[in-house]
Amino acid sequence: MTATLERRQAQGLWDRFADWVTSTHNRFYVGWFGVLMIPTLLSATICFVIAFVAAPPVDMDGIREPISGSLLYGNNIITGAVIPSSNAIGLHFYPIWEAASMDEWLYNGGPYQLVVFHFLIGVFCYLGREWELSYRLGLRPWICIAYSAPVAAATAVFLVYPIGQGSFSDGMPLGISGTFNFMFVFQAEHNILNHPFHMLGVAGVFGGALISAMHGSLVTSSLVSETSYEESQNYGYKFGQAEETYNISAAHGYISRLVFQYFAFWGANSRSLHFIMAAFPVIGIWFTSLGISVMAFNLNGFNFNSSIVDSQGRAIYTWADIVNRANLGMEVMHERNAHNFPLDLAGTESAPVAVSTAKVGG
């Protein structure tokens, strides 16, 4: 019998790079999506930090009245932001080479587009990287599906909404006060609080938080005690141990007795329980993202502009009227120099600023 030995061919540089990129033994999994994710997120982060600290004022409304957003121009951590690109730019792609000078690019809010586009590409790649690592480890794809909820939300406020409104100046500013300003203006223009998709999102986030708190407290409370009465119950569990030490039947029985017998049907086994925990907030945020996307094209929330009137034709004010007045007030205040008279106020009869209160003791 003859044995033939062949010398193993040395791997080329590309093959070694590919093995390193796709290796699941690295402390930090890179992956092919990571090859694009790392530079885009680094670019977005570096540009955001520089712009947040030192960017000059930006003519966001396109009326030659720049808005200061950086720390060096008088803002603090709360009021600072990367200001959206100018309304004069609209939806045009505005990289550095499209401007006549760096000063012009900064004045028109070019850093906002740079940060947003690189950030969106980065989070898309992070989602793909989650799928890629799950695939290589033989896991199911639910991790990246769950992550698609915040990705959809970011895409809605940074990309879909500006496209629907016709300008990146309507995108969400990259700062704390800017985020709240975006929320107020969104409520004023679209009445998002009365949109059913937003209601589903609120139910999903709050319901998910409730389920998470219930689950964590139940698991912690139903640890199997493997200790004697003289020892602390905490000695019955070692942090990081492989085997389960809690009793799901005990937790299930607790919930069924605490509320009612059939309430805990979805927690009858670990799979159904954790599916509900994942699906509840994810589906809610999906609906909120979809709601922002349809309101981007002015398919707005419900409005109750027609007040209830009595037999004499006098208005009977409801909470809907209070919300309408608040919306009008917020719309008057935002972009007050660009819009001297908002259209929905100019086209109707003047309305009192406040609802009159009943006389006391009269």
From Swiss-Prot:
The D1/D2 heterodimer binds P680, chlorophylls that are the primary electron donor of PSII, and subsequent electron acceptors. It shares a non-heme iron and each subunit binds pheophytin, quinone, additional chlorophylls, carotenoids and lipids. D1 provides most of the ligands for the Mn4-Ca-O5 cluster of the oxygen-evolving complex (OEC). There is also a Cl(-1) ion associated with D1 and D2, which is required for oxygen evolution. The PSII complex binds additional chlorophylls, carotenoids and specific lipids. It comes from the Bacteria. Residues 347-362 form a propeptide. Pheophytin a binds at Y126. Chlorophyll a ChlzD1 binds at H118. The chain crosses the membrane at residues 29-46, 118-133, 142-156, 197-218, 276-290. One of its GO terms (cellular component) is plasma membrane. InterPro entries: D1/D2 (IPR055266), Photo_II_D1/D2_sf (IPR036854), Photo_RC_L/M (IPR000484), Photo_RC_L/M_CS (IPR055265), PSII_D1 (IPR005867). Fe cation binds at H215, H274. NCBIfam families: psbA. Cyanobacteria usually contain more than 2 copies of the psbA gene. This is Photosystem II protein D1 3. It comes from Gloeobacter violaceus (strain ATCC 29082 / PCC 7421).
